[in-house]
UniProtKB/Swiss-Prot annotation:
<keyword id="KW-0805">Transcription regulation</keyword>
<dbReference type="GO" id="GO:0005634">
    <property type="term" value="C:nucleus"/>
</dbReference>
<dbReference type="InterPro" id="IPR003340">
    <property type="entry name" value="B3_DNA-bd"/>
</dbReference>
<dbReference type="GO" id="GO:0003677">
    <property type="term" value="F:DNA binding"/>
</dbReference>
<feature type="region of interest" description="Disordered">
    <location>
        <begin position="363"/>
        <end position="405"/>
    </location>
</feature>
<dbReference type="InterPro" id="IPR015300">
    <property type="entry name" value="DNA-bd_pseudobarrel_sf"/>
</dbReference>
<keyword id="KW-0238">DNA-binding</keyword>
<feature type="compositionally biased region" description="Acidic residues">
    <location>
        <begin position="386"/>
        <end position="395"/>
    </location>
</feature>
<feature type="DNA-binding region" description="TF-B3 1">
    <location>
        <begin position="26"/>
        <end position="119"/>
    </location>
</feature>
<dbReference type="InterPro" id="IPR044837">
    <property type="entry name" value="REM16-like"/>
</dbReference>
<feature type="DNA-binding region" description="TF-B3 3">
    <location>
        <begin position="435"/>
        <end position="529"/>
    </location>
</feature>
<keyword id="KW-0677">Repeat</keyword>
<dbReference type="Pfam" id="PF02362">
    <property type="entry name" value="B3"/>
</dbReference>
<keyword id="KW-0804">Transcription</keyword>
<feature type="DNA-binding region" description="TF-B3 2">
    <location>
        <begin position="235"/>
        <end position="335"/>
    </location>
</feature>
<feature type="region of interest" description="Disordered">
    <location>
        <begin position="141"/>
        <end position="201"/>
    </location>
</feature>
<keyword id="KW-0539">Nucleus</keyword>
Length: 536
């Protein structure tokens, strides 16, 4: 009996210690990664309710190597979702499907995260390449300014000790979102403490739902390495609304503006490297709408520097920016972003002439479905049926010189012209023949797209992931993006509308896609057009 009482006493002591550890709260939860968890993560309702549903604005995730990541928390369909910043955390730690994450709440809105692989073994992370960032966190912890590694849809770089950049991290992306139409519009963001960005080690912030192609990213990174800014720069890809006269405007990231721009509507100063002229646009701030806009004399900056759609403006705060709000603006031209040599930085602001690149591969990244189980419908967001355009390809023998989708049919004259063209190419790969339909030449950019057939994809080994595809025609290039739908369908979406518009394609025209090269980050195809008048 005495032994039994002793055991009970020890058990009570253990229980008491455990209760003290919990501090009366539910401190931990576990999430297993699924295919839908890469862009967003749903917090368990039971855990959120235990805290009275008090998770909004942002939280901080502390990774096993000590880096702090600021992640936006939003409410959607009565669910609490980790969104902006989450993908950067996932990418930085190479988190994969079936990995498990243990979140432990160590203080208000701050979580320690342990990461386990699919075998339930803890992943080990090194601080190599981000030593400066780790050091900054330790030094600044006493002043309550935590270093952050903010996130975006596009890839970025973290400084290491030698000033180079690591591909493991993401560029900050806490900007006002832009709609798929390409127009800027402010999005609602909860307030972030200014210290979160002020001590950030990220070299630049990229607007949310914007994407840098490999060409663009190389040029931006080269510029950042060259100028070595002491503070985080803001990278803006020019949209139609940013450069369209008579009243262009530019939306500034809410979180970036909180740190580097004034907290009220005032005039700011813009300057160009090696130029004496200054511009004084009006910085317009409206707190209730989380809206931060440059307007007014912004039009003069656009006109004087001949800023065009798809150009990239890199805003770097000057040393005294917190007092006089002055920014040096470096301009990367569209043509320069795709040039094969040099840094591509237009320092003098002079015109580079007509560009041979019609699109800088800017992508409007859409929010992924919140529900862990994706709702499959007969039509996707772009109005395209989830049912593939082809069940199998037709035309010709087992290894045909060209491939036509089974739902498309060539007339006798069309077939003759196509075969003559294909013979002249002498391509090692089958040529894809696409007869333009209404969905391929839509005036609306969000609905204009082209599917690449499954058999063609297999013949030229198209990747099963999103990929930049450069289209060539008559010495000019257009950057498009191939996206994956329903797991196997490959659609040219972003940039395809511009190709259609610039080449004046219409229903009934025929495009022949000749596969050229497949590098790691991009595909290149030559496109030969046969206009419908030629087949009459």
């Amino acid at each position: 009996m005495a032994g039994s009482g002793s055991c009970m006493k020890k058990s009570c002591v253990c229980c008491q210690k455990y209760l003290e550890h919990l501090d009366g709260k539910m401190n931990c939860f576990v999430r297993r990664m699924t295919a839908d968890s890469r862009r967003s993560m749903i917090m368990p309702c039971k855990f959120v309710n235990h805290f009275g549903g008090d998770f909004s604005g942002t939280i901080k995730l502390q990774s096993p190597n000590g880096i702090l990541y600021v992640v936006e928390v939003t409410k959607c369909k009565n669910k609490t979702v980790l969104r902006c910043g989450w993908e950067a955390f996932v990418d930085a730690h190479h988190i994969e499907e079936n990995d498990s994450l243990l979140f432990r709440c160590v203080e208000n809105s701050r979580f320690e995260v342990l990461i386990f692989d699919s075998d339930d073994c803890e992943k080990v992370f090194s601080c190599a390449g981000i030593r400066n960032t780790c050091k900054s966190i330790q030094e600044k912890s006493s002043s309550s300014c935590d270093d952050t590694a903010e996130s975006s849809e596009s890839e970025g770089f973290a400084r290491n000790q030698k000033g180079s950049f690591s591909h493991r991290r993401k560029t900050a992306n806490l900007a006002s979102s832009s709609e798929d139409s390409g127009e800027d519009s402010p999005s609602e963001h909860e307030s972030v403490e200014s210290g979160d960005l002020e001590t950030s080690q990220e070299p630049y912030v990229l607007s949310r739902r914007s994407y840098l192609s490999e060409f663009q990213k190389e040029k931006v990174d080269a510029l950042i390495q060259e100028i070595q800014p002491e503070t985080t720069a803001f990278v803006a890809i020019m949209r139609k609304s940013n450069v369209q006269l008579p009243t262009p405007f530019l939306v500034i990231s809410f979180c970036y503006a909180e740190v580097h721009f004034p907290h009220k509507s005032v005039t700011v100063t813009l300057q160009r490297p090696c130029k004496s002229k200054k511009w004084h646009p009006r910085f317009y701030k409206r707190k209730d709408a989380r809206m931060n806009i440059l307007r007014g004399s912004w039009v003069e900056f656009v006109k004087d520097n001949r800023v065009q759609e798809q150009d990239i403006c890199v805003f770097v705060p000057t040393k005294d920016a917190r007092r006089n709000f002055t920014f040096t603006v470096h301009l990367l031209r569209v043509a320069a972003a795709y040039s094969w040599g040099g840094t591509g930085v237009d320092r003098a602001g002079s015109s580079l002439g007509r560009t041979d690149v019609k699109s800088a591969s800017e992508i409007s990244i859409k929010e992924e479905p919140i529900d862990q189980e994706e709702n499959v419908s007969s039509r996707n967001r772009n109005g395209v049926s989830d049912e593939s355009e082809e069940d199998e390809d037709s035309e010709g023998p087992a290894h045909p010189p060209y491939i036509v989708p089974c739902k498309s049919h060539l007339s006798r004259l069309q077939k003759k012209i196509v075969e003559e063209k294909v013979r002249s190419f002498q391509s090692k790969f089958p040529v894809y023949v696409a007869i333009m339909k209404k969905s391929n030449v839509e005036r609306s950019a969000s609905r204009c797209q082209l599917e690449l057939g499954a058999r063609f994809a297999a013949a030229v080994h198209l990747p099963d992931r999103r990929q930049t595809v450069v289209l060539q025609r008559r010495g000019e290039r257009w950057a498009t993006v191939m996206q994956i739908r329903s797991g196997t369908r490959r659609l040219l979406i972003s940039g395809w509308h511009r190709f259609v518009r610039d080449n004046r394609l219409r229903v009934g025209d025929i495009c022949l896609f000749e596969f050229k090269t497949h590098e790691r980050w991009r595909l290149t195809m030559a496109v030969h057009a046969i206009f419908r008048e030629q087949c009459c």
